[in-house]
UniProtKB/Swiss-Prot annotation:
Disulfide bonds: none annotated. One of its GO terms (biological process) is argininosuccinate metabolic process. It comes from the Bacteria. One of its GO terms (molecular function) is argininosuccinate synthase activity. CDD domains: ASS (cd01999). Pfam families: Arginosuc_syn_C, Arginosuc_synth. One of its GO terms (cellular component) is cytoplasm. This is Argininosuccinate synthase. It comes from Shewanella woodyi (strain ATCC 51908 / MS32).
Length: 408
C-alpha cells in the first residue's frame, strides 16, 4: 500500500477493536491506506470476560492506535437491550435467543459516542462481507450518525485468509497471539457465546466437547437436580434465590448455576440476513433459565388472545433485532406495545435444572388467571357445565352452516 497513492478525506477514525487478528491488522492498514489518518481504538466491554480485555489498551497502541477507549456496557446491555427484548418473547427461528444480535446496537451506539467525543469523521468495523454484523453495525451508524463515513476493510483489502493477515502483521513486526490454526470463530458477551467455523461448517459433524466453553456436557452434569427460585416484576428478573440483584448480576449468577448443569446449548442452521445459511453452536445458560421463568409466569397471567398477540410481537421483534433495526420507529413501537403485557408478568418461579434441561416446576403470580376452582373436574359452584352447550353451538356455527350448504 505504501507504493500506492493514499486516500484522503479521513483524518480521524474510531475502530471497533477487539484485539483479535482482524482488528489488529486493520489499524496499520488504515494508517497505510488513508493519508495522515489518526486511529482511535474502541472496545466495548459487554461481558466477554477479563481474558479478552487484558492488555487490550497496550496492544492497540502497539499496533498503531493513538488511543484506546474501553467502555463498560455490561449493565446497560442487560437492562436496556436484553431485558426489553426477552420481555417481548423474541426468539429467532424458534431457537436462537439473539445473543450476538442484541449486543450490536449498544456497541454501535457507544462507538458513535466515542467518535463524537474525539471529533472523528469516520467509524470502522472488522465485519466480513458475508456476515450479518456488517449490516447490523452499518444500519445503526446510518440511524445514529449518517454524517460519519463507514470504513469496512474486509470489503476493500485484498487479504482473504488468516494466513494473509498473519503475514501482513509479521511484515510490520506487529505481535499477535493469533495463529493460523485457530479452529473456531467465537463471539462472547454476558448473554451467550457463539461458535462457528472449523468442522462445524459441515452440518454432518457433531460438535465435540472442545467446542463448548460456558456449559458442561449434559451427560457430565450432576446426577442430582438443582432448584433455582426466580422473582419477576413487570417482566424483569429481580431476585435469584431470594437475593435482590441487578440485571447483569442476576444473569451472571444464572450463567454459573445453569452452565454447571449443561443448560442452554443449541446447534442450529440459521438463515442469515444476507441470504445464505450458516451453522452456529450457541450457549446461553442463564438466558435460557430467564426465558423459561418468564414464559412460566406468562402462562398464568396472559389470556389466550393476549398470549397470541405477544407471540406475534415476539416473532416480529426477533427478526427486527436479528436484522439490526434496533434504532427504528418499529422497534420503539414493538417495545412500547409489549410493555402493558409485561407489566402483568409478576410472580415467583422455581426452575429445575437437570442434565441440560431447565423446567419450571413451581409458579405463582398475584395476577394469575388460573383458578383451581374453575379448573377442577370435581363438583363446584362457579362453573355450570350445561353452559358449555350454547357456547359450543355458536362456536361451531360456521362449520354447521358449511355442512348444510354442501348437502343442499
Amino acid at each position: 500500500m505504501s507504493a500506492e497513492i493514499k486516500k484522503t478525506g479521513v483524518k480521524k477514525v474510531v475502530l471497533a477493536y477487539s484485539g483479535g487478528l482482524d482488528t489488529s491488522a486493520i489499524i496499520p492498514w488504515l494508517k497505510e491506506t488513508y493519508d495522515d489518518c489518526e486511529i482511535v481504538a474502541f472496545c466495548a466491554d459487554v461481558g466477554q470476560g477479563e481474558a479478552e480485555l487484558e492488555g487490550l489498551h497496550e496492544k492497540a497502541i502497539a499496533s498503531g492506535a493513538s488511543e484506546c477507549y474501553i467502555v463498560d456496557l455490561k449493565e446497560e446491555l442487560v437492562a436496556d437491550y436484553i431485558y426489553p427484548t426477552i420481555a417481548t418473547g423474541a426468539i429467532y427461528e424458534g431457537t436462537y435467543l439473539l445473543g450476538t444480535s442484541m449486543a450490536r446496537p449498544i456497541i454501535a451506539k457507544a462507538q458513535v459516542e466515542v467518535a463524537r467525543k474525539v471529533g472523528a469523521d469516520a467509524v470502522c468495523h472488522g465485519c466480513t462481507g458475508k456476515g450479518n454484523d456488517q449490516v447490523r453495525f452499518e444500519g445503526c451508524f446510518a440511524a445514529l450518525a449518517p454524517d460519519l463515513k463507514v470504513i469496512a476493510p474486509w470489503r476493500e483489502w485484498e487479504m482473504v485468509s488468516r494466513e494473509d493477515l498473519l503475514d501482513y502483521l509479521a511484515e510490520r513486526n506487529i505481535e499477535t497471539t493469533a495463529s493460523a490454526t485457530k479452529i473456531y470463530s467465537r463471539d462472547a458477551n454476558a448473554w451467550h457465546i457463539s461458535h462457528e467455523g472449523g468442522e462445524l461448517e459441515d452440518p454432518w459433524n457433531e460438535p465435540t466437547k472442545g467446542v463448548w466453553t460456558m456449559t458442561v456436557a449434559p451427560e457430565d452434569a450432576p446426577d442430582k437436580p438443582e432448584y433455582v427460585t426466580i422473582d419477576i416484576e413487570q417482566g424483569k428478573i429481580t431476585k435469584v434465590n431470594g437475593e435482590l440483584l441487578s440485571p447483569y448480576a442476576a444473569l451472571m449468577v444464572l450463567n454459573e448455576i445453569a452452565g454447571a448443569h449443561g443448560v442452554g446449548r443449541i446447534d442450529i442452521t440459521e438463515n442469515r440476513l444476507v441470504g445464505m445459511k450458516s451453522r452456529g453452536c450457541y450457549e446461553t445458560p442463564g438466558g435460557t433459565v430467564m426465558f423459561a421463568a418468564l414464559r412460566a409466569i406468562e402462562e398464568l397471567v396472559l389470556d389466550k388472545s393476549s398470549r397470541e398477540w405477544r407471540e406475534q410481537v415476539g416473532a416480529q421483534m426477533a427478526h427486527l433485532v436479528y436484522d439490526g433495526r434496533w434504532f427504528t420507529p418499529l422497534c420503539e413501537s414493538l417495545l412500547g406495545a409489549s410493555q402493558p403485557l409485561a407489566n402483568l408478568v409478576n410472580g415467583e418461579v422455581v426452575i429445575k435444572l437437570y442434565k441440560g434441561q431447565a423446567q419450571a416446576v413451581q409458579k405463582r403470580s398475584p395476577n394469575s388467571l388460573y383458578s383451581e376452582e374453575f379448573a377442577t373436574f370435581g363438583e363446584d359452584d362457579v362453573y355450570n357445565q350445561k353452559d358449555a352447550e350454547g357456547f359450543i353451538r355458536l362456536y361451531s356455527l360456521a362449520s354447521r352452516i358449511r355442512a348444510l350448504n354442501s348437502k343442499s
